[in-house]
Every structure is written in C-alpha cells, then in structure tokens.
Amino acid sequence: MIDLKQYEFWFLVGSQYLYGLETLKKVEQQASKIVDSLNDDPIFPSKIVLKPVLKSSSEITEIFEKANADPKCAGVIVWMHTFSPSKMWIRGLSINKKPLLHLHTQYNREIPWDTIDMDYMNLNQSAHGDREHGFIHARMRLPRKVVVGHWEEKEVREKIAKWMRVACAIQDGRMGQIVRFGDNMREVASTEGDKVEAQIKLGWSINTWGVGELAERVKAVPEREVEELLKEYREKYIMPEDEYSLKAIREQAKIEIALREFLKEKNAVGFTTTFEDLHDLPQLPGLAVQRLMEEGYGFGAEGDWKAAGLVRAIKVMGTSLPGGTSFMEDYTYHLTPGNELVLGAHMLEVCPTIAKEKPRIEVHPLSIGGKADPARLVFDGQEGPAVNASIVDMGNRFRLVVNKVLSVPIERKMPKLPTARVLWKPLPDFKRATTAWILAGGSHHTAFSTAIDVEYLIDWAEALEIEYVVIDENLDLEDFKKELRWNELYWGLLKR
C-alpha cells in the first residue's frame, strides 16, 4: 500500500552568473556526479532529481513554484556549491511549501595541497556559500534540516535518507484523509483535538462517517471473497478450525473486506473506530483492524484520530525497514524494584508487524461493545530498541511526546491474556520516564515502533513546526520541567 518510489526529491544547487560559464559548467558536472552516486545507493527510498544550477532570483522562484505544484515532489535538498547571494533566494524560500534539507558538503573530500590555486578556491566555496544560505533561513525563521559532512560519508547519507522518509510521510499525510467511524470515546480528554488545526499544521483531513454505512457494506460482502480471505489467513497465521472460531473469523473477514473497500474509496490513509458506536456491526473490529494496519493504514481506537495519523506517518517513514509500527496503549505495569516494565497492549488492535512470532487467530469474549465474541491476532512483540510517541493538543499547539524504550523478552507465559502484547523498559528508567511523560501530558494511546528511531520524529516535528519533547537516556527531570515551561512561553509568543 505504501510506495516511497512514487516520490522524488529535487536537488537544488545554488550559484550565480558572476562566476562565468566555465565555472558554472563544472558546478553542474560535479553536482550531477553527486546525485548519480546518491541514486546508486539503496539507502535512499526515493529518486533524487538534479535541477539546473540556480543563478538568479527568477530561476529560484520558478523552481519553488514548480516544486509546490508537483505532488510527486516530496521535498527539496539545497546546496550552495559556490557563493549564491541569499537575497536571490528570499522570494523562492518564502513560497516554498515542501520540506527542505540544507546539505552542507563539498565535492572534494580533501584539499589538494600540492595543486590548490585560486581556480580551485573559486569553484569550491560551499564553506562560505552555505553559511550565507544558512543565514537567510535563520533570518526568515524557516524550518529545515541541516546535514553537514562529505556526501560520500555513511552518516551523511543515513541522515539524508531518514529525512527523505520523513518528508514522504508529510506528503502522504497531505494527500489522504483519516476516516472516523463514530466519535471519540465519551468523556475522554486526551483523544480530543482541533481537526481544523490538524489539517493546517499536519496536513491530515479528518472526517466522520456513520457506522451504519459500514455495517451495510459488511452485510453485502460476497461469500466467495470471504473464502479467498480465509485461505490467506490460513497461510499467514495459526488459525483454529472449530465452528465457534470460524464463525467469528468469517465476520471479521467481512469487516476487513468492507473496511478496505470503504477506505480506498475515500482515499484514506488511516481510520478510527469506537466500541461505543458499533451500530449493526456484528463484532468490534479486531482482526480486520490488525490486518489493515499490517497493510500500512494508520489506526486509532476510541476515535483517536491523532494516534491514527501518527501511526500512519511512522509506517510511511519505516516502509521496507526492519521492524514494525503499531497503535499501542500503556496497559499495565510490572513494578519489581530495579526491573520496572510496561506491558503494552489493547483490547484487540495491535499490528502484527511488531510480532516476534507467527500470530495466532483467537476468538474470546469481549464485554466492552456488547457485540459477539471478536476474532483477533495474538502474539508477543519484537525485542530491541523502540520508540513510543504520542500527539496531544495543548490548546494553542500540538505537542509530540517521544520516549525511547527497550522492548524486552516476555519470559513468562500469559495463557489467559487474549490480546497481542509487548513488554518494554522506558529510558532512562521507569520512574523518571513516566514522570516526564505525565508532566508533558502524553496520552495513554501511542504509536509504538521498532522500525524507526527518535531522529525521524524530531525531523517530522521540526518540518511541521510543532512542539516536541524527548524522553531518553539523557533525561534530567529538572531540565525537562524547565523545557516545558520555556516551551509554553515560546509557543505562546509564536505567531505563525
């Protein structure tokens, strides 16, 4: 469902006519070699497209106009090979709507000590050209990612590739919508939010459809489509064959087919459900939701559209990377002193992309929702480094709360727990991490990912100009409290 190859990134090289045709030709040749080399590296998720060297204000403005109008262009990378006076860039940068990365590099890795002359100095001027360019970004208060180092370095390429994945997620969010079936769970605060502001800042179009419309589609699903889907279930999962289980699984298959059809019609990238509004649905969607998340859709339970959008964004960022991403909830604690852990789960809806084993389809009673016993996938989660992230609406801005965690083995069986689960240790430790999370107002609903790291989420928040706070191994609680207070002042004063 998610294809990052559909996007491209425009590589913009700055110079000026002052240098003459011979120097400008060398600039173009060297830029072409850089871009060709980058495109040969499989680390990059999308194609990088070199545009003609930019030498005047009109050329710069025109290229940004074209980038804004091209839905394939997910972002722009700028590099000043020579000195490119930044007043020429003001009009173009002022209209730019695409995520921007400023690459501060140089064609040659080393100074040619024996042969360096003024021709070389005249050509290789990014050392001061990019400083000039950095000033105009700072002066205009523009969001951007800055990557410094030689373009052949692994670390440089890794940072560019991460940012590209983030930019793809931003473009994806601007092109699709989040479908809400029903409203938020009654009386819950943290799942609420300003949907208009979300579309302005995050690009997400969030709209509601009646559950009855989905229920009618479920009733109309042809039996042959159900049988085809059951074959797929048997291949991918450990599936029971008793009559009680099969009846429930068939109902989830119908819900999955109807949901997928509906989401495709609406060009949706994510969706929400709520157990308080199920109308004529036979079950609370469980297996169906897990399967659609596995395809790449974002999801939020109990109407949590912010969680749905964040899960989708991270799924785009992590496309084709090892690991997975899921809707998650901090459910219960293991509080042995010195080994405090969080058990993450939800009633039904945990994505199998984070499973460490072949998932089992199980059918169990669920009193919440008042419907028939729902089928769901049950498994233990993957182990290793992960992130837990939440978006909350602070009234005058969105805040992204991010916690680095370590997913650990589940060493004891839980034979009576009928839901997928993952066990993690928050960093730096349970008490400090949880204190910081609560101080920041982080939600009980999160996006949990073993596919990405914190840098992706920082890049995402900075590109979208929303607040973020990070809870990791370097946490100092007193400094964190100060950061929250300073942020309150900064975002209160900011008028953008």
Swiss-Prot record:
Cellular component aspect of the GO annotation: cytosol
Keyword field: Arabinose catabolism, Carbohydrate metabolism, Isomerase, Manganese, Metal-binding
Gene3D superfamilies (alphabetical): 3.40.50.10940
Catalysis performed (reactions): beta-L-arabinopyranose = L-ribulose
Cofactor: record remark: Binds 1 Mn(2+) ion per subunit.
Enzyme Commission number(s): 5.3.1.4
Cofactor: Mn(2+)
EC top class named in words: isomerase
A GO term for molecular function: L-arabinose isomerase activity
Amino-acid positions noted as binding Mn(2+) in the UniProt annotation, renumbered to this chain: 302, 329, 346, 445
Presence of the UniProt keyword Protein biosynthesis in the record: no
Keyword Manganese carried by entry: yes
Pfam families: AraA_central (PF24856), AraA_N (PF02610), Arabinose_Iso_C (PF11762)
Origin superkingdom: Bacteria
Entry coiled-coil feature ranges: none
InterPro entries, A to Z: Ara_Isoase_C, AraA_central, AraA_N, AraA_N_sf, Fuc/Ara_isomerase_C, Fucose_isomerase_N/cen_sf, Lara_isomerase
GO biological process: L-arabinose catabolic process to xylulose 5-phosphate
Pathway: Carbohydrate degradation; L-arabinose degradation via L-ribulose; D-xylulose 5-phosphate from L-arabinose (bacterial route): step 1/3
General function of this protein: Catalyzes the conversion of L-arabinose to L-ribulose.
Entry's family note: Belongs to the arabinose isomerase family.
Protein's name in the database: L-arabinose isomerase
Native source species: Thermotoga maritima (strain ATCC 43589 / DSM 3109 / JCM 10099 / NBRC 100826 / MSB8)
